Amino acid sequence: MTTPLKDKYELEVIPIAIGGKKLDLLGLANWDSFIKNLEEQGEEYIRKFPFWVKIWEASVVLADHLIRIGLGKEKDILEIGAGMGVTGLFLGAFGYKITVTEYEEDALELLRMNVEHNGLDTVTVKKLDWNDPDLTETYDVICASELIYNVTFMEPIIKLLRKYLRPGGTVFLAHDVRRKCMLQFIGMIPGKYEIENIAKTMKRDDEVHKVFIHALRLK
């Protein structure tokens, strides 16, 4: 029997506002002590780091960008590697129909909790294994933030995009400018896409974060 998320982590409500709407997201409460405990494990730190517990600046920037440009309420949207699901949850808050996916069971539980907590009835949460994807639908838009932090993910994601993006569809990928893996990934993308690179900035806790958004439009 799996341990409930609330018994593994101390959770708190984190209010976030994007595009004039506010969501109350359940997230990690003891962030500083959590990171300190992981760092004390030395080499195990990165391997064990649960990337899904952090609200990445790129996910906030991506949500804001997609809300501003407008995607069309009739479109089917997929978020991959959702983590905390900031982008997908806010798209749902604005009435978009979106499937939000993750692989880690704890991340999936937290996503479902936040969907229920915020009453987002246009958001569906599904498990997705990039190496063995089993979704039955295709999508007009696929989005992700801070998706690639390991080169071994690149080929499976290229195949996943090819499998699930509809003709004429668009992929939106957002990342901090310091993430070199994503720039390497964009260089591997086949010539079937027209690529637009968009630079954004976000100020958070007196720090300016520079974020790239890559819009890949299937020709």
Residue ranges and their predicted role:
Residues 1-219:
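S-adenosylmethionine-dependent methyltransferases
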